[in-house]
Amino acid sequence: MKILVVQESDWIKRNPHQQHHLMERLTLRGHQVKVIDYPIDWKEEKGRYNRRNVVDGYYKIHPESRVQVISPTILKIPYFSYPSMLFYHRREVKRQIKEFEPDVIIGFGIINTYLASRTAKKEKIPFIYYWIDVLHMLIPENGFQALGEYLERATIKNSTQVIAINYKLEDFVKALGAKNTKVIGAGIDLGKFDPNIKSSNIRQEYGINNEDTVLFFMGHLYNFAGLKEIALELAKGHNPNLKLLIVGDGDAYQELQDIIKENNLSSKVILTGLKSYNEIPELVAASDICILPAYPDEKIMQDIVPIKIYEYMAMCKPVITTKLPGIMMEFGDDNGICYVDKPSDVIFKSYEIDIIAEGRKARKFVEKNDWSKITNEFEKTLQDLQK
């Protein structure tokens, strides 16, 4: 099967998401996959435009997989980037339909996904709108968010099927008008995220002793991530053997560094910066409890369930999270997830939980989410659209 994917983030630079796992695994099964992507961090690069670029045989997770990544030309000028995207991505979609002749098109974005859905409908090509996030809420220019939602609704109307990564997100897309919906949950590589991975080297590298209890966070360090509140709570003189290990970069990184310096927390709060995906399992193994302390009223956190939660659970790690609706709906109670009202409460909850017992519950809950099973379900969905 020939599969064309369109998305509005950088396929190569960003950490693996649902689409990376699925598409690479599909190529291992003999399917051909081409991806049209967009350098969302273009403001950090020099120059006024990027020329069209094609990377053949790219993989992020599986060395044997082969995905072609196409980055159309864009103008890197504020307020002109979106119009240029409309022009060049529309042209690229039409080019791929003519040259590649895809059997199905799958969209993970807003603008280029809308363009692809229109063209797919016109050319009578099955189109899947795959939701792993509420994307219009992530648009940095607030004035464009309403337009983003309008395009999402229009794309839903053009879609053959709408897939959501969790049930809360399925409710959200139904409210936007989606009818033919399906939930295909996040997958886990149960071999890679093995609870028996040794972590002594990581603990030694970061000065973590055997008697220390480590809280672990990984991901983009948004200001609403709740990490600053936890660091400040640690500064109040809690258990000296409680440490916070943070993997990632982002908006709150500098402020976290300042908090660490001003409160002499260098031995209690560890910032590793960005790490490769292959390093993550050993880092998770070095922790005792994983956390997602995002502000519970943050809009973009209401309907999502990050894949990393499943990966933590696969490694027998209990997870402490604020009461986020998507996560509460997905996991419920007594499945290795512990809920708190606000970020600073994570510290107090960590004293209460039975780490081993909750970790076992977590592992048991996610064992059904092995990537091979998720890929089977997704592949069957694609094949059914061909009938």
Per-region residue spans from a language model:
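A short helix/loop element that forms part of the nucleotide-sugar donor recognition site in Leloir-type
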Residues: 194-208
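A charged, aromatic-enriched C-terminal amphipathic alpha-helix characteristic of glycosyltransferases
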Residues: 356-384
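Nucleotide-sugar-dependent
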Residues: 13-17, 225, 278-282, 290-311, ...
